[in-house]
């Protein structure tokens, strides 16, 4: 099948051209298939004489796992061969090198770039998690990039991977110390959650330029691993609250308090729901159908919300689409929906102002009639504070919290209020505040729609989309 030669190994059907890298027991080469396609592949060449029992087990595990899975963000094992001297794993070639080199040549990655990579890594890990597979050696060196131009992440090197249910525990030390979860070193007892710690270390390194336990010596590294100190995040560069929240929850030393796989995959910063895929366009169109229906029914607020949710899927649909003509058609549709969203925004804003005026009048009358009710006056003061907070830019969540606190009190008071004019006004006030709270919830949903602003800028739609889905 193959035989040794000077310099590069020989393998039937392939021409090996250059060494890409080497590890503990394997060397990886770039190669071309001799077929007409001249397909470029990476060949992992493992010298049999270098294998001990543990490395044979690792190699067999890697082959077993990789031959049974296909995922756009996991390196594909195309075939494997062997001869008297070597075992050859013929794999998908990734021209962009590894994530470690990508990070260090740029020193740090912008949050928006790190987020795209994290979304892709999360997608691969979700696929593995559904099959009870744990990687156990996640690190930037084991994450490859499809190319340097618009790179896609590819998870590689499954030599330490294991079939593990979430409740399985292992006691064998595996992985690289800088990226290894503390429980692997301190307790020699661990489960699948160690992969989540490693994800946190990778994200930390991408954003801050080095892993949290970067050390000058192994003894210093061991001290940091065994310490009980909380992992502190640098203040610079400035990161979004969602990003910092995810990092802190991933880098929780106690696995029982670490973010779960379910919560990781559902985390708003990861946002797997809006990852570019073949389904993005269909999801966007389905939401547009609902938006048009609500629009025709005269429910402007619901229609606006649905149009904005649809646009959240049109963005990844544009990313996913490679055909220039179809891409232009999508952009044209997006332009139409943005225009309608602008019109709906004006309608909703007008209704909002009318609701505010009505609420102020009722509250003034009710305040006059509540001079002998300190608890009622206090609840109305909280409602007034909510109205004031709502006028401040970006304070919707604070205003909503105040509205909910006020409503909690007012509903109790309403139930105990005797029939009469004050009860009627109190009932009206509760209805107004509930409407305000519901409106704010919708506002927050819209604001939390994760527009990839930089992507939209490339499409020339950023400002119009953002302004259309932001109510004043």
From Swiss-Prot:
Top EC category: transferase
Modified residues (Phosphoserine): 176, 350, 384, 464
Its EC number(s): 2.7.11.1
UniProt modification remark: Autophosphorylated. Autophosphorylation is blocked by interaction with SUFU.
Main location as per UniProt: cytoplasm
Keywords associated with the record: ATP-binding, Autophagy, Cytoplasm, Kinase, Nucleotide-binding, Phosphoprotein, Repeat, Serine/threonine-protein kinase, Transferase
Gene3D superfamilies in the record: Phosphorylase Kinase, domain 1, Phosphotransferase system, lactose/cellobiose-type IIA subunit, Transferase(Phosphotransferase) domain 1
InterPro entries reported in the protein's UniProt record: Atg1-like, Kinase-like_dom_sf, MIT_dom, MIT_dom_sf, Prot_kinase_dom, Protein_kinase_ATP_BS, Ser/Thr_kinase_AS
GO cellular component, one term: cytoplasm
SMART domains attached to this UniProt entry: MIT (SM00745), S_TKc (SM00220)
Catalytic activity: L-seryl-[protein] + ATP = O-phospho-L-seryl-[protein] + ADP + H(+); L-threonyl-[protein] + ATP = O-phospho-L-threonyl-[protein] + ADP + H(+)
GO BP annotations, alphabetical order: autophagy; fibroblast activation; negative regulation of smoothened signaling pathway; positive regulation of smoothened signaling pathway; protein autophosphorylation; regulation of autophagy; smoothened signaling pathway
Domain MIT, first and last residues per copy: 280-348, 375-444
Disulfide-bonded cysteines: none
Record: residues binding ATP: 20-28, 44
MF-aspect GO terms: ATP binding; protein serine kinase activity; protein serine/threonine kinase activity
Location(s) in or outside the cell: Cytoplasm
Domain Protein kinase: 14-270
SUBUNIT field: Interacts (via protein kinase domain) with SUFU.
Recorded family membership: Belongs to the protein kinase superfamily. Ser/Thr protein kinase family. APG1/unc-51/ULK1 subfamily.
Role this protein plays: Serine/threonine protein kinase that acts as a regulator of Sonic hedgehog (SHH) signaling and autophagy. Acts as a negative regulator of SHH signaling in the absence of SHH ligand: interacts with SUFU, thereby inactivating the protein kinase activity and preventing phosphorylation of GLI proteins (GLI1, GLI2 and/or GLI3). Positively regulates SHH signaling in the presence of SHH: dissociates from SUFU, autophosphorylates and mediates phosphorylation of GLI2, activating it and promoting its nuclear translocation.
Annotated protein name in UniProt: Serine/threonine-protein kinase ULK3
